[in-house]
Structures are given as structure tokens and as C-alpha cells.
């Protein structure tokens, strides 16, 4: 499994970047960590070979 993050607040992004993201904000490191935590938990035990896109809808918007 893979976590594919979009723009994350740990990097310096232009303020206008938020305008291109359907949710209207930059993602957080905590959101990526929570997704990773889920993937390694027993709750995701039957999920295999998946790419989880965590980008606030950016990919869908393209």
C-alpha cells in the first residue's frame, strides 16, 4: 500500500496554492500520519496493493 500526499503544510507553498485545491486548504502532516496509521492497523487488514490519495481532491480536480 502507498500513501500519496498532495500539498502538505510542512513545506513552504505559495498562498495561491490553496485556490487550486478543491477543499480550499493545504493538508497537514497529521492527516498523512493518520492515513498511514490506519493502513498499518488491523482495521486495514484486508486492504492490499492500494494507493491512497490524500490530496484534498487535487487529483480529481485535474
Question: What is each stretch, according to the model?
Answer:
Residues 21-32, 43:
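A conserved structural motif in NAD(P)-dependent oxidoreductases
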Residues 2-21, 31, 61-62:
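A glycine/serine/threonine-rich, flexible loop-to-helix segment
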Residues 7, 25-28, 50, 57-58:
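Gly/Ser/Thr-rich helix-start
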Residues 36, 40-44:
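Short, hydrophobic alpha-helical segments
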Residues 37, 48-62:
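Short C-terminal tail/terminal secondary-structure segment
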Residues 1-9, 40, 53-55:
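Conserved SDR Rossmann-fold cofactor-binding beta-strand/turn motif
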Amino acid at each position: 500500500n502507498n500513501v500519496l500526499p498532495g500539498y502538505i503544510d510542512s513545506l513552504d507553498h505559495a498562498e495561491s496554492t490553496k485556490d487550486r485545491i478543491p477543499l480550499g486548504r493545504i493538508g497537514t502532516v497529521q492527516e498523512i500520519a493518520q492515513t498511514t496509521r490506519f493502513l498499518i492497523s488491523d482495521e486495514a487488514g484486508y486492504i492490499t496493493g492500494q494507493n491512497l490519495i490524500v490530496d484534498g481532491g487535487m487529483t480529481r480536480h485535474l
